């Protein structure tokens, strides 16, 4: 069940990054350039199976100037 949740979250992150890129008129190659990464590496990330680190997500948020994640507060509960 945890593996399924991990994959679902990865796809949600990728969807959010795609949404931001589209809204800003950017492509994956632009993101690669902003992050100093190869287009191939960004392409692998965007397949939805990459295990994003917090540092990577922060770098992407900074490069795009838009939030990717929303941290759930204490009063909110996570579905089990």
Question: PLM features: residue spans?
Answer:
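N-terminal flexible/basic segments that precede or flank functional cores
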Residues: 1-19, 24
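Residues that mark the N-terminal boundary/hinge immediately upstream of a DNA-recognition element
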Residues: 16, 27, 38, 53-56
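The alpha-helix within a helix-turn-helix
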Residues: 21, 32, 61
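Short alpha-helical DNA-recognition segment
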Residues: 25-43
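DNA major-groove recognition helix of helix-turn-helix/homeodomain DNA-binding modules
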Residues: 55-70
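Short, charged recognition helix plus adjacent turn
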Residues: 72-80
């Amino acid at each position: 069940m945890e593996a399924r949740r991990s994959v679902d979250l990865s796809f949600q992150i990728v969807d959010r990054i795609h949404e931001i890129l589209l809204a800003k008129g950017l492509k994956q190659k632009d993101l690669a350039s902003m992050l100093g990464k190869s287009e191939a590496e960004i392409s692998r990330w965007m397949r939805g199976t990459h295990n994003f680190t917090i540092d990577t997500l922060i770098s992407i948020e900074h490069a795009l100037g838009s939030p990717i994640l929303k941290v759930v507060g204490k009063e909110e509960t996570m579905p089990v």
